[in-house]
């Protein structure tokens, strides 16, 4: 999806402010029937990406498994920390598709409940300046 630039010129459509952290949402609403005629990239995606978490003692990640007990959080290998990037989902655990969000600070209440797939490693201060309706111009992925 990134290689096809489907996120280019998409807006940050929701910013949720908590006392210690912000959640900054963007992506493509699946129900909007996004359809790129030239590349036929997406056509009404619904819940195609399962919840994925990685536990310390497991070799492979777990799919569709959600940690609800706070005691289980210590078994995770990835946590919501400043700059984390994760998939948005509806109430169902395997309902992620083309929407994502960033957190601007640690947010342990989300640990084990959302798939973290990236992190801002450069320019974190810019993340904290994003306003609702700002546009995505470019996404760069590095290892």
Q: Where are the model-predicted features located?
A:
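Cross-family detector of peptidyl-prolyl cis-trans isomerase
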Residues: 1-143
């Amino acid at each position: 999806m990134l290689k096809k630039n489907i996120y280019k010129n998409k807006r940050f459509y929701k910013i949720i402010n908590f006392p210690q952290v912000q959640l900054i949402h963007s992506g493509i609403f699946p129900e909007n029937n996004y359809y790129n005629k030239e590349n036929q990239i997406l056509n009404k995606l619904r819940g195609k990406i399962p919840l994925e978490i990685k536990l310390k003692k497991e070799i492979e990640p777990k799919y569709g498994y959600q940690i609800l007990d706070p005691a289980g959080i210590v078994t995770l290998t990835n946590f919501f920390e400043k700059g984390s990037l994760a998939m948005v989902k509806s109430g169902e655990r395997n309902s992620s598709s083309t929407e994502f969000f960033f957190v601007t600070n640690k947010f342990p209440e989300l640990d084990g409940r959302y798939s973290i797939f990236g992190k801002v490693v450069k320019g974190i201060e810019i993340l904290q300046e994003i306003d609702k309706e700002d546009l995505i111009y470019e996404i760069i992925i590095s290892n």
